[in-house]
Amino acid sequence: MERLKCTVSYDGSDFAGFQVQPDHRTVQGVLEKALYNMHKGKSIRIQASGRTDTGVHAVGQVIHFDSPLEIPERNWKQALNTLLPDDVRIQKVEKKTEEFHARYSVKEKEYHYFVLNEEDPNVFQRGYVYHEPRKLDLERMQEACQYLEGTHDFTSFSSAKSSVKGSKVRTLYHVSCHQTGTNIEFIFRGSGFLYNMVRIMMSVLIDVGKGKRNPEDIIDLLASKNRQQIGKTMAPQGLYLWRVSYEENGNNV
C-alpha cells in the first residue's frame, strides 16, 4: 500500500460542503467516486486536513489516501483529473510514508476572505466574494487585525455548533487585510481554526470597518468568551482555504 498526499482545489458553489452526506453532492463524495472508479469498484476512503462548509472554496485543500496501485505521481494527477468534474482539480500528488496524516500532521493553515466593497454587486463575482455596499475604513480594519494575532481563547469566535470539547485556545500567526481597487482581501494564518472561526472574525472586522465597533473592542470580545457578543456569521462564498502546511523532514511544506 502506498500513501498519497493530494493538494486539491475546488469551487464550493455547487457542493453541500466537503464531508460526504447521503443524497448530497460533496467534495469528498466526488473524490471518493473517482478513486472508486480507478480501483475498479473498491472503496477508498480519504482523509482531509479539515472540512469546509457549503459554498466555501479551496485553493489548497490537502487530502491523503492509501492505495495498492503502483502508479507514478504525475500519472495519479492526470488519471484523477480525468475522472473528476470541472469544479474539482488535483493540483499536486506526492507519495508519503504512513506517518503522514492530512489532518493530524498539519502545522499551519491559511484562509483568505474576499470582500467586494462597492455600491453595486458584481453579477459575475456573486458566488466568490462577499458584497458590502457601505464604504469600509481599511485603516481601522487593519488595526483590528492586530488584536486577533497571537494566542487566545477564541470561544467568542466559535460557532455554537462546534464539536470541539476541549480547549478553544488557538494561535494566529498573521492576520491582515489589503485593498486592490474595490476588492479587499483578508488573510488569516494560524495553527488551527475552530468551526466558523474565520467567518465570525470577519463579522467583527466588517463592523469595525463600518464604524459600528472600535478596533480595541476585540480585546473585550476575546475576554468575554461569549459567542452572543458577536453578530452574524459572515456568508461562506467569500472564504477560501488557501494553504495547508506540514512539518516534513524539518521543512515547512
UniProtKB/Swiss-Prot annotation:
Its EC number is 5.4.99.12. GO terms for biological process: tRNA pseudouridine synthesis. The active site is at D53 (nucleophile). Gene3D superfamilies: Pseudouridine synthase I, catalytic domain, C-terminal subdomain, Pseudouridine synthase I, catalytic domain, N-terminal subdomain. Keywords: Isomerase, tRNA processing. Substrate binds at Y111. It comes from the Bacteria. PANTHER family: PSEUDOURIDYLATE SYNTHASE, TRNA PSEUDOURIDINE SYNTHASE-LIKE 1. Formation of pseudouridine at positions 38, 39 and 40 in the anticodon stem and loop of transfer RNAs. Belongs to the tRNA pseudouridine synthase TruA family. Homodimer. This is tRNA pseudouridine synthase A.
